[in-house]
Amino acid sequence: KPHFHLMDAHNLEFEDEFFDFVYGCAILHHLDYNRALDEICRVLKPGGRILFTEPLGINPVGKLVRLMTPFARTDDEKPLMFKELSELEKRFNTRHYYEELFSVPLGVASGILFDNPDNWLTRLAFNLDLSLNRMFPPLRYLFRHVLVVGTRK
């Protein structure tokens, strides 16, 4: 059964090497990134696993959306760039899965055009993302989000 605690993510009140697994969804880009990674390493057992999904700051459409929607942002928000991805590599053995290049804009269009989200446009966008990720790996950095799966070094 999970237990929930409210505390400073930069100074967790858990013992060293306490957790087997640490999960986060769109949280790291709101924190002092290196301090947060250090704290995750501290509370994670050797060989412990991480799973994070975070926005990428490299995507030009994402940059435009952030510029056009400042009311939906917080001052501490810093989507991940190459530097942050390399900081992860220093502490964890990771695999990265990139998602949402075409699926975001075409998903929005799909929501306007169709009542049912399971339609040809949504499927096309999803399959385009999968294909581009496989066939043109350098494009992965232009995707909107990254899913990071890793093990503590």
Where does each model-flagged region fall?
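Conserved SAM-binding strand-loop segment of SAM-dependent methyltransferases
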Residues: K1-E15
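A conserved beta-strand element that flanks and buttresses the S-adenosyl-L-methionine
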Residues: Y23
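A short His-aromatic
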Residues: A26-H30
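A short glycine-rich, Lys/Arg-flanked "PGG" loop and its adjoining helix->strand segment in the class I
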Residues: R35-R49
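Conserved class I S-adenosyl-L-methionine
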Residues: R49-D76
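Short alpha-helix
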Residues: E77-Y98
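A C-terminal cap/extension of S-adenosyl-L-methionine-dependent methyltransferases
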Residues: Y98-K153
